[in-house]
Amino acid sequence: MTRYMLDTNTVSHLIKKHPAVARRVVATPMAFLCISAITNGELFFGLAKRPDAKQLHLAVRELLLRVDVLPWGGAIAEHYGTVRAGMERQGKILAPLDLLIATHALSVGAVLVTNDRAFGRVAGLLLEDWTD
């Protein structure tokens, strides 16, 4: 079965109980869901900005207990350099953290689950939008 890497915006939709996203997550075995260590960092950044949001903290920590957080480094870093250089040559840009997440998904052969169309600029990246 396909591995699905949830982008930060998809995790946010899940935590906010977006019906379509929740349905897809429930229908997908947890072994096939993952997030990037970059998304993990973004989640903790969001929590640091809202230290009093107890329900949010609980929801994020519960998710992190259930989903694989894939480490970022080594071969992924090399792939990032190649992809970024190629995109710059073509005049394509993507937010820095988004490009780190995109190359992570590419490197591990995962479909990136996001509703951010900007990820479509990354050649070869498989995308799905679960907010539909």
Annotate each predicted stretch with a short phrase.
Residues M1-I35, F45-L64, D132:
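Short, well-structured N-terminal submotif of metal-dependent ribonuclease cores
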Residues M1-T2, A102, L106-D132:
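Acidic, PIN/NYN-like endoribonuclease modules and their adjacent C-terminal/linker elements
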Residues D7, S36-T39, N115, A123:
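A secondary-structure boundary/capping signal
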Residues D7-T8, V21, L43, Y80, ...:
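Generic structural signal for small/hydrophobic residues in well-ordered secondary structure
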Residues T10-V11, T39, I76, I101, ...:
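Alpha-helix capping/helix-boundary segments
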Residues V11-S12, A22, G41-F44, L70, ...:
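Nucleotide phosphate-binding site architecture
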Residues V67-V113:
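Active-site neighborhoods of divalent-metal-dependent phosphate/nucleic-acid chemistry enzymes
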